[in-house]
Amino acid sequence: MEPVSMDKPFMYFDEIDDELEYEPESVNETPKKLPHQGQLKLLLGELFFLSKLQRHGILDGSTIVYIGSAPGTHIKYLRDHFMSMGLVIKWMLIDGRTHDPILEGLRDVILITKFVDEAYIRQLKKQLYPSRVILISDVRSKRGQKEPTTQDLLSNYSLQNIMVSVLKPAASSLKWRCPFPDQWIKDFYVPHGNEMLQPFAPSYSAEMRLLSIYSGTPIRLKCITQQDSSKYEKKMYYLNKIIRNRIIINFDYSNQEYDFFHMYHMLKTVYSNKSFTSNKSKVLHFHQSIFRFLKIPITNTEKIHHEPTQRKVPSKNTMLKSRNTKKSVRGNKQGRRT
């Protein structure tokens, strides 16, 4: 891992300031993974998104329709957090797979075991009227293989476009990963939105969340081309290969790895009904409560490889001035492209 100073993480795709040509051999690297990392990634992104809606006065009184929600373990944390803030929210969780039993028996949570298609979305629209809808989509292919094909992605994005156009949500968070240029089939459309980057995504994941707040005007779509695909691949590879393998030395926190730095800046935007002396103490509270909920061990900064062994210093009170130089130190590299 490379020790560097950074003022803030890249929160959105358009902030990534460099590119790197994709190296296929990266798929052979051993990924570094936390327990329940997928649920952690979803929880942080959705907590950030819903807190933004809370700030805009959109969340209270809404119905959150979450399509592709199973197993949804992390949703219990979100539900409990916003309930503790006094917000009235209904949750409608829809997936053809089984949900975590932790979500059963909650009077404000409806569990529906069903894979969604256009006909069902239109039926759902009638059921939801006149509710204010917040849409979260984590749809993925029903195929057996682990990685979706380009055709799977195009089908998913077509279905998400239907969700947005039919349900007319006040806001949405959609799953979004551009197909890779060497697997390109055709140009396609997605809604306009902010492309949010995700801490604790798999090591070489190019997946983002497409966040939108709608103002009642017609939904605007943008065309994605193969040229765009090349840009997405190079920028996301740079993010994963270079940026996410950094230790942020000016980040005053127990774990200075980049993903924790990214998480910190997300969690500091979250509201709480508790009083804290600083942003750091608030973030630490949420960090620890989320990790406890998901049963993830609390870790400190990973030791940098080739770090010199510390030696005893003479008892004489001497100090060396910092030479303020930056050294590139290589450490564990991560995973695979998804």
From Swiss-Prot:
The keyword Transcription is annotated on this UniProt entry: yes
Example GO biological process: methylation
Keyword annotations from UniProtKB, A to Z: Elongation factor, Methyltransferase, mRNA capping, mRNA processing, Protein biosynthesis, S-adenosyl-L-methionine, Transcription, Transferase, Virion
A GO cellular component entry from the record: virion component
Active site: K175 (for methyltransferase activity)
Residues reported to bind mRNA: Y22, R177, C178, P179, F180, D182, S205, A206, E207, E233
Region entry Binding to Rap94, spans: 169-333
Enzyme class: transferase
Binding sites annotated in the UniProt record for S-adenosyl-L-methionine: Q39, Y66, G68, G72, D95, R97, V116, D138
E.C. number(s) listed in UniProt: 2.1.1.57
Region (Disordered): 305-338
Binding to NPH-I as annotated region, ranges: 169-249
Reaction(s) the record says it catalyses: a 5'-end (N(7)-methyl 5'-triphosphoguanosine)-ribonucleoside in mRNA + S-adenosyl-L-methionine = a 5'-end (N(7)-methyl 5'-triphosphoguanosine)-(2'-O-methyl-ribonucleoside) in mRNA + S-adenosyl-L-homocysteine + H(+)
Intracellular or extracellular location(s): Virion
Pfam families in the record: PARP_regulatory
Family assignment from sequence similarity: Belongs to the class I-like SAM-binding methyltransferase superfamily. Poxvirus/kinetoplastid 2'-O-MTase family.
Subunit structure: Interacts with poly(A) polymerase catalytic subunit OPG063. Interacts with OPG109 and OPG123; these interactions might help linking transcription to capping and polyadenylation.
Protein name: Cap-specific mRNA (nucleoside-2'-O-)-methyltransferase
Underlying gene: OPG102
